Every structure is written in structure tokens, then in C-alpha cells.
Amino acid sequence: MIIIISGPPGSGKTSVAIKLANELSYKFISAGKIFRDIAQKMGLDIINLNKVAESNFDIDKMVDKKIFEFILSEKNLIIESHIAGWLFREYTNIAIYLWAPLKIRANRIAIRDKISYDQAISQIIKREYMHYKRFNKFYGIDINDLSVFDLVINTSNVDVNNIVKLILTYLSSVSQNPQPLKEKDINDK
């Protein structure tokens, strides 16, 4: 089964995806890690690579290609990505969206990245604005449309372990192996 975990910065998607992958003994891949690796190779931080990506679609295509290669080659996979739910939904079994209010996400990011709360707020707003513009421009995606997701979870007042339990309960309640909407074909992406 291939499961997508999407959501905005600070929603808990990486922590939840890693824990879920461990619980299910699935392979885990992170679009954010792929993106950060590209940034590091280019000598940029995330904000500046996002700025470059606004005018250079090749950066997003590199990330997308890498993710799609995993989709084609893995049977049991957890994909953590801001936009995989929209891009790859038709090739996967389950798509989950995690979210939390901006203040909670900023607090999490401030603690995680050891920056001030105000810096975290500023970073999130910049990243989300860049994501919204870029994903709409290049993919025609409205990241506010959550209709592609099977499950949407507010992570505000729930810890990672309980979110994973909730997801596992959901997975046990759906068809043993919900089918992707489309057969995997390398020529598609």
C-alpha cells in the first residue's frame, strides 16, 4: 500500500509519516528531504531555493521524478510531501492531510529549528505564499482544496502517537487494499 501524508509546514507530517512507516514497516521518503538536499547542493537555504523554484520548474520536476520513481518501485511506501496528495493521488492507495493553526505550527517550528516564534511565523508565511503561487502556476493546484484526501486531521491537540493510532484505525476500516485510481506508468510523469 502506498500512503501519502501531506500538509503545511509544522503540521507534523514528517514526524507522523516516520512513525507510521516504522509501525507498518514501510519505506519512508520525504519530498522535503529531497528538496533540502537540492538546496544544500546549490548552497541555498529552503526560502531561497523556493524563490529560485518560483521561476525554475526544473527544481520541482527533480523532486517529483524522484518521488514517482519510488511509487513505481515500492509496494509499501509512506510519502511525506506538501503536494504529493494532489500530484500523485491517482497512483496511490490512501492520501492523508495533516494541519494545525498557524500559531501552533509556528511554535513547533520555533522549537524544532531553534528560532524565535516571530521568525517561525515569518518563515511559514513566506513559504506558504511561495508554495501557493508556485503550485498553482506550475501544476494548476489549489492547495486549499482538500477534496483529494481520504482523511484530514487537525494535529493541534493530538500527539504523534495518537495521530498514528488514528491513522492505523482508519486504515483498518477501509478496504484491505484500496486500489490506486490509475495504473503506474513511468511515461505519465
UniProtKB/Swiss-Prot annotation:
One of its GO terms (molecular function) is ATP binding. Transmembrane segments: none annotated. Keywords: ATP-binding, Cytoplasm, Kinase, Nucleotide-binding, Transferase. It is an enzyme of class 2 (transferase). The keyword Ribonucleoprotein does not apply. It catalyses: CMP + ATP = CDP + ADP; dCMP + ATP = dCDP + ADP. Its EC number is 2.7.4.25. It is found in: Cytoplasm. Its main location: cytoplasm. One of its GO terms (cellular component) is cytoplasm. InterPro entries: Cyt_kin_arch, Cytidylate_kinase_dom, P-loop_NTPase. CDD domains: CMPK. NCBIfam families: cyt_kin_arch (TIGR02173). This is Cytidylate kinase. The gene is cmk.
